[in-house]
Amino acid sequence: MGRSKLASRPAEEDLNPGKSKRKKISLGPENAAASISTGIEAGNERKPGLYCCNYCDKDLSGLVRFKCAVCMDFDLCVECFSVGVELNRHKNSHPYRVMDNLSFSLVTSDWNADEEILLLEAIATYGFGNWKEVADHVGSKTTTECIKHFNSAYMQSPCFPLPDLSHTIGKSKDELLAMSKDSAVKTEIPAFVRLSPKEELPVSAEIKHEASGKVNEIDPPLSALAGVKKKGNVPQAKDIIKLEAAKQQSDRSVGEKKLRLPGEKVPLVTELYGYNLKREEFEIEHDNDAEQLLADMEFKDSDTDAEREQKLQVLRIYSKRLDERKRRKEFVLERNLLYPDQYEMSLSAEERKIYKSCKVFARFQSKEEHKELIKKVIEEHQILRRIEDLQEARTAGCRTTSDANRFIEEKRKKEAEESMLLRLNHGAPGSIAGKTLKSPRGLPRNLHPFGSDSLPKVTPPRIYSGLDTWDVDGLLGADLLSETEKKMCNETRILPVHYLKMLDILTREIKKGQIKKKSDAYSFFKVEPSKVDRVYDMLVHKGIGDST
């Protein structure tokens, strides 16, 4: 049995872009209701075709078909095969296989043999845990049905890992088909029988009490569903379950969005960290290549004792690496590191820096001990900061607590205004270059970007006493410069961020045609022309500007 068609496979689109191997019924509420209404009028239910002819689009479910052994997922009906149909890459000279009717129960009465094969193919393709893709591959079963059937028929089988086939061994195909028909007759319910409240399906109450007017228009009445003459009650339940899933999907996709609390944070765990919440796995685990150690290892009867012991040692090493991977994942989940820390977000910039520096000790402490350590360290920082503020206030002449608090508040406000001005002027080097290029930080000698509290309390004559030697290494943007550019910045005393901004402005203006020679660039910057010349020469060296 070949694998069924999926719309996402490019190979199928090459063979026949306009046709799909499996006919899928849309899960929209309108289509789901229409499918139930059609089943009511016809007197029986129609299942989506598992296989279709690639040429005439005939439903081949339960019929003999011819499968090409060369082309991927290419099937033909008997009529098209008999006349030698050729389509795209498929030729009538290709080898083929005759695929017989497998619409009979093999393991359980509610699963046909072809559905069993599709289930195993899907698990082999998508792996365990991707049950939504597995259900889409099978086509005629829901995700819950696939999980339940695999667990009961395979995982809990007395013949594990094989299913229990004791009731089908030795029986012919006709006998299996007859058994399937008998099981269908036994599950049949009398026509026009009213279901009692206890026998009503769980979704009936939801269908009855649906408050939405649009959904009520498409929901068929329960009496109509219960009074339909069908072969069995199980297929009827599947249709209603599909309708419920359709309504849930519709509510999620096109319904009203649920209001979210202003303070509620929804971290994009999968996007940011590559973590799958449902499978509880990372896309890239710690020591992700650990399996390569024993990927090609094989135990043979001809192995000597030394070789066997060596392979066992490899297995022990691999086991330890798996234990370390598990320990790290449990550490991340236990400490809730995938989500933003509300306590960290409530801290100031300096306190947040201390918080991050203490994270390295988390591996040596329990969660409660580490949290207590961080609180104590931050409290110590706050106390020291308060002592420094009070000492500075006393030096300024404050004698009471209220005067000191007023002085500290004004100081904080002034620092905030200065930092705001620095951020506003950061993008325009020409506006502040003439005033701030007197120190390696791009600020006046009596101003520091982190405030006076981050500097030692020394007398003014001793501040920046070692600025005779200019070195831009370690400054912001220095890692983006070459050695030649760093040397030029040291010689001209230009900050790396200012140099990069000047390069950007000069490059854009040269491309616009505003700067055609070196002297045209002087008007764009409020710095010495010699510094502009050096930056312009660097552009000429890179082949951007004109040397004139």
Curated annotation (Swiss-Prot):
This is Transcriptional adapter ADA2a. Residues 461-548 form the SWIRM domain. It comes from Arabidopsis thaliana. Residues 1-30 are annotated as: Disordered. Residues 365-386 form a coiled coil. Zn(2+) 1 binds at C53, C56, C77, C80. SMART domains: SANT (SM00717), ZnF_ZZ (SM00291). It comes from the Eukaryota. Transmembrane segments: none annotated. Interacts in vitro with the HAT domain of GCN5 and with the DNA-binding domain of the transcriptional activator DREB1B/CBF1. CDD domains: SANT (cd00167), ZZ_ADA2 (cd02335). It is found in: Nucleus. The modification N6-acetyllysine is found at K257. Required for the function of some acidic activation domains, which activate transcription from a distant site. The exact mechanism of action is not yet known. ADA2 stimulates the acetyltransferase activity of GCN5 on free histones or nucleosomes, probably by opening up the promoter region.
